[in-house]
């Protein structure tokens, strides 16, 4: 069984009771560090805090692992209980939806444990949630890749009088200066 467990938005203590029970019952635990990071980061001390509270050794799943080697995780989950921890809510990123689809195709059972995400926490801004238009992702540009689709989406939201939630890309392995948004 693959448990995809949302950790919420704060620190290691924001996991739900159901999520903590699932993690403690798993043979293997992965922490996805590609789409987002907990506020405490993932340096060795922060990882040790997670491991101490959860009572499990945690393997960090970076972008390469999530995009290229996640089938290894799914093969493990076919034989034993595996937890895949994600910041926020599991379905806050298409990456995790893809993981569920791939697991189902491989015959791996999946249980999703939801938590708070940026998508429902934006109400703290005081803006009305039902007045948000399409959410946009703003990636890092490279010399070869400079997408501009988010400009049009933002313009459409503005034209309709809607707020826009902007999700900024992060560079987990390159944490200096402006690499984290």
Sequence positions of predicted segments:
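A short, acidic, amphipathic alpha-helical segment used as a generic capping/interface helix at domain edges
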Residues: 73-76, 150-156, 181
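A contiguous loop/helix-start segment that scaffolds small-molecule binding in enzyme catalytic cores
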Residues: 2, 81-82, 158-181
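Class I SAM-dependent methyltransferase SAM-binding "motif I" and its flanking Rossmann-like core
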Residues: 88-164
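Class I S-adenosyl-L-methionine
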Residues: 1-109
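Short, solvent-exposed coil/turn linker segments
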Residues: 62, 128-131, 181
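Short beta-alpha junction loops
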Residues: 35, 116-118, 170-172
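Residues in flexible loops and secondary-structure boundaries
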Residues: 31, 66-69, 121, 130, ...
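Secondary-structure junction/capping motif
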Residues: 41-43, 113, 117, 179-181
């Amino acid at each position: 069984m693959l448990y995809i467990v949302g950790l919420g938005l704060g620190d290691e203590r924001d996991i739900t009771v159901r999520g903590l029970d699932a993690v403690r019952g798993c043979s293997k635990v992965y922490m996805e560090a590609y789409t987002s990071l907990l506020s405490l980061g993932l340096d060795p001390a922060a990882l040790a805090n997670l491991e101490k509270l959860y009572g499990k050794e945690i393997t960090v799943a970076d972008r390469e692992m999530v995009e290229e080697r996640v089938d290894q995780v799914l093969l493990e989950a076919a034989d034993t209980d595996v937890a895949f921890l994600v910041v926020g809510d599991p379905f806050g990123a298409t990456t995790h939806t893809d993981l569920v689809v791939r697991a189902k195709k491989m015959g791996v059972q999946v249980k999703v444990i939801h938590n708070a995400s940026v998508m429902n926490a934006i109400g703290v801004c005081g803006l009305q949630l039902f007045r948000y238009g399409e959410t946009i992702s703003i990636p890092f540009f490279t010399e070869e890749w400079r997408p501009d689709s988010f400009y049009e989406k933002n313009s459409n939201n503005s034209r309709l009088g809607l707020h826009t939630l902007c999700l900024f890309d992060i560079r987990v392995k390159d944490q200096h200066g402006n690499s984290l948004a």
